[in-house]
Amino acid sequence: MRKAHYTVRNKEVQEHAAGLLLRHLNLCDFSVKCTAQILLHVLFTAAARLTSIVATCLHLKNAPSKETIRKALLAGLPDYAKLQKALNRALAGDLPKPLRKRKQRMAIDLHLVPYYGEAWEDPKEIYRSQAKAGTNSFHAYASAYVVLQGQRYTVALTPVERGENMKTVVQRLLGIARTASVRPRLLLLDRGFYSVDVIRYLQAARVPFLMPAIARGRKPGNGKPAAGIRAFKEWKRSGWGSHQLVSGKRKATVSICVHCSKLRGQRRKRGRAAWVYAYWGLQPNSTRWVADTYRERFGIESSFRQLHQARITTCTRNPAIRLFYVALALILRNVWVWFHWERLSSPRRGRRLLRLERLRFKALLLWLQHMAESIFGVAEETPTERQGKLEYRA
């Protein structure tokens, strides 16, 4: 019997994404000419074109003016604290039920968006870090991400202030994920979370974790061996150990895994490399398993790359608007993940087969853009004070 064939259309994608935002953000119509649906059409187009609201309003011929869209957005969004809760509800809006029933591997990372302006109200809004893209000022966001093939959803997002303890950030992210009924079976963390406070909190919360150990301690030289984590970096063979971190009067003990491998031209390097991992709550059977498991965390880096494929450009100092644009990109990415799992995957015995070639993330964004262009039209002219002369004729 011939298999049935179905299609997914751009209208269905647009209605699903818009419904998710309308349901969880409670967006209301600003005016007759600027309804919540029209506002979302403009926002989706700006995300797809990676431009600002101003440029998008100029691109869409019959769209409301840039000032109307700006006022509609400011009027429609709740205050900063309520906005964070609403955005996290939208991120969790498409999570499948099986994902909530069992504990999952999760990754937590910190994402820095370069910023070149002044703070809006509080200097703590601007996060300071190592210089990147010509600045050491950033808007910082931490996110939690489910590490599961085919269902790699971002389940929690929170802004990070200057000087904020990473333990507080991890605690807040796990609380948001718990509200969405997502619980960690294993937490994969970036090296930026390698601290006594974070480790002590996770151990007290009974959350198994795995993260790289930062190379600290005495360097080898002058007849003295390396000390601290640097001593593990000198190992020639893979193995196991333990290490105690000290911060003031507080201490934390972790298990150490050293995985040695040969560099065969990776990153233009050759020779031996020792990768040192700190973990707790696990009983790994090999150092290879530890290294391969931690590599799964790099999926969150892919989500950040896709975030930049859909983040609206802005020069506003308002941290609420900036947070909304970052969350909007992640929500659209979650919509893309949902469509691939629920509608575009092929059924088969065992685990369903993902068919990413059927709809790339950038193609989904273009669908949203084309929907808006079909409604408002595309501006194909611009005003000028000079009269041109047609010099070349066919």
Annotate the PLM regions:
Residues H41, I53-T56, S65, I69, ...:
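Short, conserved catalytic/metal-binding motifs centered on acidic residues
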Residues A205-L307, E380:
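An anionic, glycine-rich sequence signature occurring as long contiguous blocks
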Residues I126-V182, A273-W275:
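Electropositive, glycine- and tryptophan-enriched low-complexity nucleic-acid-binding patches
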Residues G163-G221:
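Domain-level cores of phosphate- or acyl-group-handling catalytic modules
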Residues K71-V147:
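Active-site-proximal, Lys/Arg-enriched surface segment
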Residues C28, N285-T293, Q306-V326, R343-P347:
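Short, solvent-exposed helix-loop connector elements
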Residues G76, A81-G93, Q369-A394:
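Long, charge-rich low-complexity segments
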